[in-house]
């Protein structure tokens, strides 16, 4: 990991078209501005981790959902519109 020291108003250039600027430093909070093309996805790491966990949970149905589906299939109570 590259570690840099920057003051408010100073920037770092990533690649050819991403500029990260330190806007303000107040105590232990740093405001950062990111200038990047729309094609570059920029996410806060904690929100990305939360989104990944939510997606993982959504992709894994609960045992109750699976059991209810199995019962419906066994009893022929599906939602087939032709029945």
From Swiss-Prot:
GO molecular function terms attached to this record: mRNA 5'-UTR binding
Coiled coil: none
GO cellular component, as recorded: cytosol
Listed transmembrane segments: none
Domain of life according to the entry: Bacteria
Protein's cellular compartments: Cytoplasm
InterPro entries per UniProt: CsrA, CsrA_sf
Keyword entries, A-Z: Bacterial flagellum biogenesis, Cytoplasm, Repressor, RNA-binding, Translation regulation
Main location, first listed in the record: cytoplasm
Signal peptide per UniProt: none
Biological process according to GO: bacterial-type flagellum organization; mRNA catabolic process; negative regulation of translational initiation; regulation of bacterial-type flagellum assembly; regulation of carbohydrate metabolic process
Pfam family, one: CsrA
Quaternary organization: Homodimer; the beta-strands of each monomer intercalate to form a hydrophobic core, while the alpha-helices form wings that extend away from the core.
Family designation: Belongs to the CsrA/RsmA family.
General function of this protein: A translational regulator that binds mRNA to regulate translation initiation and/or mRNA stability. Usually binds in the 5'-UTR at or near the Shine-Dalgarno sequence preventing ribosome-binding, thus repressing translation. Its main target seems to be the major flagellin gene, while its function is anatagonized by FliW.
Name of the molecule in the record: Translational regulator CsrA
Organism field: Nocardioides sp. (strain ATCC BAA-499 / JS614)
Lineage of the species this protein comes from: Bacteria, Bacillati, Actinomycetota, Actinomycetes, Propionibacteriales
Gene name as annotated: csrA
């Amino acid at each position: 990991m590259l570690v840099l020291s920057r003051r408010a108003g100073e920037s770092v250039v990533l690649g050819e078209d991403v500029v990260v600027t330190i806007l303000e430093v107040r105590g232990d909070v740093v405001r950062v501005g990111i200038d990047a093309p729309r094609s570059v996805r920029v996410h806060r790491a904690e929100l990305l981790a939360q989104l990944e966990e939510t997606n993982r949970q959504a992709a894994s149905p609960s045992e109750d959902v699976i059991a209810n589906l199995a019962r419906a299939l066994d009893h022929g109570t599906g939602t087939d519109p032709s029945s």
